[in-house]
Amino acid sequence: MRVADFSFDLPDELIARYPMPNRTASRLLTLDGNSGAVADKQFTDILEMVNPGDLMVFNNTRVIPARVFGQKQTGGKLEILVERMLDDKRILAHVRSSKSPKPGTIICLDGGYEMTMLARHDTLFELELNSESTILEVLEEVGHMPLPPYIDRPDEDADKERYQTVYNQNPGAVAAPTAGLHFDDALLAALKEKGVNVAFVTLHVGAGTFQPVRVDSILDHKMHSEWAEVPQDVVDSIKATKAAGNRVIAVGTTSVRSLESAAKASEGELQAYSNDTDIFIYPGYEFQVVDAMVTNFHLPESTLIMLISAFAGFDEVKNAYQHAIAQKYRFFSYGDAMFVTKKAI
C-alpha cells in the first residue's frame, strides 16, 4: 500500500487547539470493525460500550516539559526538544539552531543552567547537564509542555494539567497518550464500579510520533524507537481476561503498540516486556492481544491512521473519518475520540 492511500482533506477549523472544559465532555464515534457501522455518542457513553470482566489497559507515562530554550556561548539562540532521557544527566534531543552545535559546545539554558553537547547520533544530539540538579528537575523548572506542531500556539499554564492524563505515573514522554486525556477520576471509578478491570502499561511517546512519513510505500518506512513496558501483573490480567471470554480494550495506540510488542517478542505465550519497540502496525497485521480500542482522530498519512486501518479495516476507517468530518468532530490531540472494535480476519 502507498502512504497516499491514507490521505484525507481536513478543514482547518476541525483541528482542536484547546481541550474541552471538562475531560469527559468530548464526543465519541463508535466504529464496528466487522459491519463498518458508526454511531455518534458522548464520551461518557463509553460505559455502555464495555462489559463487566473486560480489561481496559492504559498508558501511565507522564509527559515531561520537554521543550527548552537557550543559547550557545557565542550567542546563537536555539531550541531543545528532548527525545529521551538517558539518565539523570544526559538526554537525546532534537536541536533547532541556525547552525548545529559541535561536540564540546556549551549551551546556556533559561534559568542559568548549562549543558554540553557530547555527540551527534544521526538527527539527534546527546547533551549532558552540568549541574547538581537532575534533568527532570531542570525541565520541571524551565521546560515548556511540548504541544504538537498542529496546535499552533504557545503552551499555557493550563496545558501542564490538560496535556497530561489523570493517572500519569512514569515521567518520560514528550507527547501525551491522547486517548487517555478523556478520562477523569469519576469516569475511572464508574468503570470499576461496573466491573471493568483496569491495568497500566508504560510507553514513553517520543517526538518521532509527529514526524511525517517521508516515503511513498509504507513498506519502506522505518519507525522511530520508543521504550515500553508491560509488567507481569498485566500479562496475568490479560490471560485471565481472555480465559474468561472477555475483551482486552486498549486505551490509545501507545497501549496497543505496547501490548502487541510484548506479544511479538514472546513468540508464543504472552510474557512481560521491558525494552525499546519500533513496531509498525499497518493493514495485514494480525493482532494478538487487543480486541477493542479507544483512540483519537489521527493525522492524514500518519502511522497511527495506518494502525487503526489495520485494526478495523481500511474502507471502514476511511468511511468513519469521512463521517466524522461531515459531523464536525474535533481532530487530533485535544480532539474527540473513537471506540473501535476489531475486524475479524
From Swiss-Prot:
HAMAP family: QueA. It comes from Shewanella loihica (strain ATCC BAA-1088 / PV-4). The keyword Ribosomal protein does not apply. GO terms for cellular component: cytoplasm. Transfers and isomerizes the ribose moiety from AdoMet to the 7-aminomethyl group of 7-deazaguanine (preQ1-tRNA) to give epoxyqueuosine (oQ-tRNA). It comes from the Bacteria. Its main location: cytoplasm. The keyword Cytoplasm applies. One of its GO terms (molecular function) is S-adenosylmethionine:tRNA ribosyltransferase-isomerase activity. Pathway: tRNA modification; tRNA-queuosine biosynthesis. It is found in: Cytoplasm. It catalyses: 7-aminomethyl-7-carbaguanosine(34) in tRNA + S-adenosyl-L-methionine = epoxyqueuosine(34) in tRNA + adenine + L-methionine + 2 H(+). This is S-adenosylmethionine:tRNA ribosyltransferase-isomerase.
